[in-house]
Each structure stands twice: as structure tokens, then as C-alpha cells.
């Protein structure tokens, strides 16, 4: 019976040795993969630190760009008053009349000032729009960094958990198909390239933002200088025109005074000539009466004697004198009429000069707003804004 029984042979000694050494191999694999997980955690943490710093830099750049965008917007708003003032000056000067409606230097500078302000507003608006677009790009880069950082934080959490698992951990168990390659898996190079791209993109957008902020400050400063230079040019032209108008007005007033004196003189002449002519009437009547009466002398007594010749000569002399006086009287009337016409033209010109002078003086009064009030307050706000920003930067440096 025993002979015929099936007896299971004992494993050879060599096979037993392989079974005995297998756990050692498993332990080595466990340690190797734990090391690999540790290295992977270090890699993730390195990128996390890099991305966190980049994210903080992006946040700071966004803050700075928002401040500079506000600066440009305030500078843009501050141009409303100069434009209103320049437009009001143009409207006032359009109130000039007749011969005073000339395209003088003041008119040219006021028109140029409006063009300069419009150009400044366009330049500042372009910078505001560029800042808005750049903020959108920075926000996109920030969101990508934040998403990448969030994923890496989650990946680190998972890998840290895996790293801390041991063969004695209660959470370990068999998993179905654990060696599968999950959908969407990437290579280490792709993983690194993705984060590097996010960082490089953020760095590029920050560089663009820094250049834009420099351009904003340069534009604000340059436009302020351009506006101030044009303001001075316009006001110089207006003051010069006011000076010229005052001189012209003084000349008109001097001519008016002389003309009025000449009119008074001619009117005195007219009165004197009229009186002189009147004074000739009775002597003429007398001489004519004598001549007429002597025509009634009878017969041979109607003699053309010396008295007759003397009376005839007297009548002729008086008549000639009256004609000369009447000629002078007419000349005096003509001179007075010419003076009155001249006086009318002078008064008309004075009215125009006074109107133009009044309008230009109103322009200068309106332009006082540019050196007091809202504009000054705006510049104070901009200075305060700059001071606050420098204070914030200093505080950040101290905290760092």
C-alpha cells in the first residue's frame, strides 16, 4: 500500500532559497520607490515655491498697474477742465465783431490748445485701454499660475500620503488594475514644461506691464508738460493781444479827443462865419438902398459921380466878401461833417475794441481756473498718490 501511495516531493533547496530572499527584494523596491516619491515631492515643492513667488510678483504687479491705471484715469479726468476753459475762450473770442474778427496769434493758440488737449486725452485714453488689456492678461496668467499651484498642492498632498504609507499601514489594500495608465497622463518633461510655460508667460506679462507702467508715467509727465507749455503760450498770446488792443484803444481815444476838439473848433468857425455874414447884411443893404435911391435922381442929376462909383464898389466888395465867407462857411461845414464821420468811425472802432478787450479779459479771468481750484487739487491728489505708493513700497521693504 505504501509503495503505491502518491508522495509529494519536498522542494529543492535552491527553490526554497529564492522564496526566502524574495521579501528582501520587496523591501528594496519599497525603499527605492519611497525615495522616488520623496524626490518627486521635492520637485513639486520646488515648483510650488517658484510658482508661489511668481504668483506673489504677479499680484504685486497687478496692484501697481491698477494704481498707475488710476493715475492715468485721474490725469485724463483732469483734462476736462482745461478743455472746457479752452472751449469757453474760443466761444468768447467768437463774439468779436466786424473788423476785429481776425485770425490773430491768440486765436491760433487757443485753437492749438484745444487740439493739444484732445491729443493728450487720446494718448491718456490709449494708455488706460492698454492698462485694462494688460490687467486682463495678468489676470489670465495669474489664474493659470493659481490653477497650477492648486494642482501641485494637491499632488504634493497625495504623494506625501503615499510616501508615508508603509507595509504596516492600515489603509493599504489590493486595488484593481492599479498599474493602468490614467487618461491624461503626462511625461515628466511635459509636466515641467507646463509649469515653466506658466512661469515664463507670467514673467513676460509682468515685463510688459512694467514697460507699460513706465510708458504711463512718461505719458502723464509729458502730457502735463505739453499742456503747461501750451497754456503759457496761449496766455502769452492773449496778454500780447490785450496789450495791442489797449494801445489801439488809447490811439482811438486820442483821435476821438482830437476829432471832438476839431469839431468844436469848426462849429465855432461856423458860428463866427455865420455872424460875419450876418454882419455884412446891413452894410450891403445900406449900399444897395443908397444906390437904388440915387437912381431916382431927376434928369441930368442922375450922374455917375464918385459917390455912385463908390457905392457900386462897396456893394461888389461886400458881395465878394460874403461869397468868400460863404465859401469858408461851406468848407467849415464840410470839415465838421468829415470830422463827425471820422468820429462815428472812431466811436464804432472803440466799441469794437472795447468789446474785444472785454472778451479777452474774460478769457484771462476764465483761465485763472487752470492755476487755482480743481486743477491744483488734482495735482495735489497725484502727488499724494505718488507719496502713498512710495510709502507702501518702503513698508514692504521693511517687512521683507
UniProtKB/Swiss-Prot annotation:
Keywords: Coiled coil, Cytoplasm, Cytoskeleton, Microtubule. It is found in: Cytoplasm; Cytoplasm, Cytoskeleton. Pfam families: Tektin (PF03148). One of its GO terms (biological process) is cilium movement involved in cell motility. InterPro entries: Tektin-like (IPR048256), Tektins (IPR000435). One of its GO terms (cellular component) is cilium. It comes from the Eukaryota. Cilia and flagella. Its main location: cytoplasm. Residues 35-81, 236-294, 310-353 form a coiled coil. Structural component of ciliary and flagellar microtubules. May form a heterodimer with tektin a or exist as a homodimer. Belongs to the tektin family. This is Tektin-B1.
Amino acid at each position: 500500500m505504501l509503495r503505491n501511495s502518491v508522495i509529494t516531493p519536498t522542494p529543492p533547496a535552491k527553490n526554497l532559497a529564492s522564496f526566502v530572499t524574495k521579501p528582501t527584494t520587496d523591501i528594496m523596491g519599497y525603499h527605492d520607490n519611497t525615495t522616488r516619491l520623496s524626490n518627486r515631492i521635492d520637485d513639486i515643492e520646488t515648483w510650488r515655491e517658484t510658482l508661489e513667488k511668481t504668483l506673489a510678483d504677479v499680484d504685486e504687479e497687478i496692484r501697481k498697474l491698477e494704481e498707475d491705471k488710476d493715475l492715468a484715469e485721474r490725469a485724463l479726468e483732469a483734462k476736462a477742465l482745461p478743455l472746457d476753459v479752452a472751449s469757453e475762450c474760443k466761444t468768447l473770442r467768437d463774439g468779436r465783431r466786424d473788423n476785429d474778427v481776425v485770425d490773430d496769434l491768440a486765436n491760433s493758440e487757443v485753437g492749438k490748445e484745444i487740439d493739444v488737449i484732445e491729443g493728450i486725452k487720446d494718448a491718456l485714453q490709449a494708455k488706460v485701454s492698454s492698462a485694462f488689456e494688460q490687467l486682463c492678461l495678468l489676470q489670465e496668467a495669474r489664474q493659470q499660475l493659481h490653477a497650477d499651484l492648486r494642482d501641485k498642492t494637491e499632488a504634493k498632498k497625495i504623494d506625501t500620503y503615499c510616501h508615508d504609507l508603509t507595509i504596516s499601514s492600515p489603509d493599504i489594500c489590493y486595488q484593481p488594475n492599479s498599474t493602468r495608465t490614467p487618461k491624461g497622463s503626462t511625461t515628466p518633461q511635459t509636466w515641467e514644461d507646463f509649469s515653466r510655460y506658466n512661469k515664463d508667460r507670467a514673467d513676460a506679462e509682468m515685463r510688459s506691464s512694467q514697460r507699460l507702467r513706465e510708458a504711463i508715467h512718461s505719458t502723464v509727465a509729458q502730457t502735463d508738460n505739453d499742456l503747461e507749455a501750451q497754456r503759457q503760450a496761449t496766455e502769452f498770446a492773449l496778454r500780447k493781444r490785450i496789450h495791442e488792443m489797449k494801445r489801439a484803444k488809447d490811439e482811438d481815444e486820442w483821435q476821438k479827443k482830437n476829432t471832438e476838439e476839431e469839431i468844436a473848433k469848426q462849429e465855432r468857425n461856423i458860428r463866427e462865419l455865420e455872424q460875419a455874414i450876418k454882419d455884412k447884411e446891413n452894410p450891403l443893404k445900406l449900399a444897395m438902398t443908397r444906390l437904388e435911391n440915387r437912381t431916382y435922381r431927376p434928369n441930368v442929376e442922375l450922374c455917375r459921380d464918385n459917390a455912385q462909383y463908390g457905392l457900386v464898389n462897396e456893394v461888389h466888395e461886400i458881395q465878394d466878401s460874403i461869397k468868400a465867407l460863404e465859401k469858408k462857411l461851406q468848407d467849415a461845414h464840410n470839415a465838421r461833417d468829415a470830422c463827425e464821420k471820422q468820429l462815428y468811425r472812431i466811436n464804432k472802432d472803440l466799441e469794437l475794441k472795447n468789446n474785444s478787450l472785454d472778451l479777452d479779459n474774460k478769457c484771462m479771468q476764465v483761465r485763472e481756473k487752470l492755476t487755482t481750484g480743481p486743477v491744483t487739487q488734482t495735482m495735489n491728489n497725484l502727488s499724494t498718490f505718488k507719496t502713498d505708493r512710495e510709502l507702501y513700497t518702503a513698508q514692504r521693504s521693511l517687512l521683507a
